C-alpha cells in the first residue's frame, strides 16, 4: 500500500466519522453506548476489517489501514469508537481468519466486514483484571463442544456482540 492509498483511507475515515459520529458522540458518551447502526454504516463505507481477504467482501488492504482508521478516530476524540473498532477489526476478525475453520471464516468474516455481525473480546475477570496470566475461566472439551466455566467483566463491544472471543485456560 502506498502513501496515496493510505491518505485516501484516512480521508474517507475522517469524512465518515464527521458525518456519522461527531453529531451524536456526546449523546453516545452520556449513554455509554455506540448504536448498532454505526457498525452497519462503517461496513457499508468499507471501513470494517479492510485488511481481511477480498473473498470475504473486504478491501484486502494491509493492517496499516486498520491502524490508520483507529488513529483518525482517536485524533478526533472518539476513543470509545476507536477501541470498539480495534477489538472488532484488529483482534476478533484476525482470530477467525487465522484460527477459525473454513466454515467459521465463511460464516463470520463477510458479516464482520459488512457490519452485520459485531465482534467482542471477553478477557477481563473480576479477580484478575486484564492480566491474562491471572485468568481463571477455563474451557473443557465435552464431545464436539466446549464448556466455559468462569466470569468475565468489561466486555468490549459486548452489548452488540454476535461473536465473542473468550480468553480461557
Predicted regions and their residues:
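A short core secondary-structure module
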Residues: 145, 149-169
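Short, solvent-exposed loop/turn elements at beta->coil junctions and helix N-caps
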Residues: 55, 123-128, 153-154
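Cytochrome P450 C-terminal beta-domain/meander region
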Residues: 131-149
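Short beta-alpha junctions and helix-cap segments that line functional grooves
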Residues: 108, 135, 151-153
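A short, Trp-centered hydrophobic/proline-enriched beta-strand micro-motif
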Residues: 115-123, 167
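Well-ordered alpha-helical segments within folded domains of soluble proteins
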Residues: 88-93
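Short glycine/proline-enriched turns and hinge-like loops at secondary-structure junctions
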Residues: 61, 131-133, 157-162
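Amphipathic, small/basic residue-rich leader segments at the start of a protein or domain
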Residues: 1-86, 97, 103-107, 111-114, ...
Amino acid at each position: 500500500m502506498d502513501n496515496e492509498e493510505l491518505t485516501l483511507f484516512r480521508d474517507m475515515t475522517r469524512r465518515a466519522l464527521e458525518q456519522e459520529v461527531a453529531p451524536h458522540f456526546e449523546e453516545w458518551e452520556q449513554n455509554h453506548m455506540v448504536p448498532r447502526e454505526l457498525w452497519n454504516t462503517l461496513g457499508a463505507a468499507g471501513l470494517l476489517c479492510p485488511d481481511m481477504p477480498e473473498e470475504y467482501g473486504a478491501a484486502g488492504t494491509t493492517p496499516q489501514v486498520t491502524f490508520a482508521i483507529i488513529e483518525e478516530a482517536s485524533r478526533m476524540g472518539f476513543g470509545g469508537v476507536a477501541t470498539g473498532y480495534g477489538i472488532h477489526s484488529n483482534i476478533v476478525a484476525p482470530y477467525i481468519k487465522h484460527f477459525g475453520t473454513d466454515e467459521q471464516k465463511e460464516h463470520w468474516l463477510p458479516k464482520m466486514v459488512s457490519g452485520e455481525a459485531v465482534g467482542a473480546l471477553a478477557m477481563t475477570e473480576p479477580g484478575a483484571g486484564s492480566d491474562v496470566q491471572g485468568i481463571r475461566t477455563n474451557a473443557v472439551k465435552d464431545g464436539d463442544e466446549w464448556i466455559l466455566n468462569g466470569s468475565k467483566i468489561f466486555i468490549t463491544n459486548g452489548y452488540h456482540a454476535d461473536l465473542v472471543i473468550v480468553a480461557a485456560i
